[in-house]
């Protein structure tokens, strides 16, 4: 892959803890290349896992690839914004109108999106919640989701595709501390929301065919082994990752029936 560094970022809202930079490849595509900071170096492969889940469940998502660049493991994704688009995050959207006392943060946000003509907002947010449940994503802060706006007309065009799901699958835990049966994530201002409460927010389970994920735990283990030389991840952790993902898929499938 031949790439050159991009001087100007396509969007200044991109931030976070991971080392990252925009580049242009030989096909003139703007690519975001991200590194890792967790000891497990697992965030990058988690992005691949998120891509596989969202693809199989037909969710709008930003696809990620795992690559070796300059001798290091990185994740690569193409810029999902066009030249006349920008992303407005939930962090900036939430305060556009005053929240009613009897309305949850989640419903308040959906009301704002519906008022701007995004009729499919609930389904898109439910997709994100399903993904975060399956992967135990603990870092869905309010700058990690939003909408896409036209910079010329200021029209809200659509809900942004799912992106940035690396902080998941117990990547910050020692192998002996990993727990795939219970955990907590972030949803708006609740930074310790139990994943077990996410299912109650899903209105239409018929949209999800979890049978399409049946062989994914084995595929996830395979790619963890493929890059084992770079992550130094022990076999015991890889096996626990696959078993944990398998349990969470089965748990959600059982709940949805």
Task: Locate predicted features.
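A broad, structural surface signal
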Residues: 48-56, 123, 127-131, 243, ...
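Ferredoxin-like alpha/beta domains used as RNA- or RNAP-binding modules
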Residues: 11, 19, 72, 128, ...
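Conserved kinase catalytic-core segment
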Residues: 105-174
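Hydrophobic faces of stable alpha-helices that mediate helix-helix packing
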Residues: 20, 103-106, 217
């Amino acid at each position: 892959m031949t790439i050159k560094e991009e001087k100007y970022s396509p969007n200044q809202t991109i931030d976070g803890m991971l080392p990252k930079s925009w580049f242009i490849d030989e096909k003139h595509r703007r690519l975001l290349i991200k590194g890792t900071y967790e000891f497990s170096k697992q965030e990058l492969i988690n992005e691949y896992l998120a891509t596989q889940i969202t693809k199989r469940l037909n969710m709008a998502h930003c696809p990620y690839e795992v690559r070796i660049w300059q001798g290091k493991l990185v994740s690569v994704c193409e810029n999902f914004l066009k030249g006349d688009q920008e992303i407005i995050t939930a962090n900036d959207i939430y305060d556009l109108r005053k929240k009613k006392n009897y309305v949850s943060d989640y419903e308040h946000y959906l009301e704002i999106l519906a008022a701007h003509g995004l009729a499919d907002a609930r389904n898109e947010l439910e997709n994100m919640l399903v993904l975060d449940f399956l992967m135990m994503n603990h870092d869905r802060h309010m700058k990690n989701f939003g909408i896409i706006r036209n910079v010329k007309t200021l029209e809200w065009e659509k809900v942004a595709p799912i992106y940035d799901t690396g902080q998941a699958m117990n990547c910050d835990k020692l192998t002996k501390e990993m727990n795939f049966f219970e955990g907590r994530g972030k949803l708006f201002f609740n930074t310790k929301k139990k994943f077990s409460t996410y299912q109650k927010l899903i209105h239409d389970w018929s949209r999800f065919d979890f049978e399409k994920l049946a062989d994914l735990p084995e595929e996830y283990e395979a790619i963890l082994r493929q890059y084992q030389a770079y992550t130094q991840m022990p076999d015991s952790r890889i096996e626990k990752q696959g078993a944990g993902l398998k349990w969470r898929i089965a748990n959600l499938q059982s709940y949805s029936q």
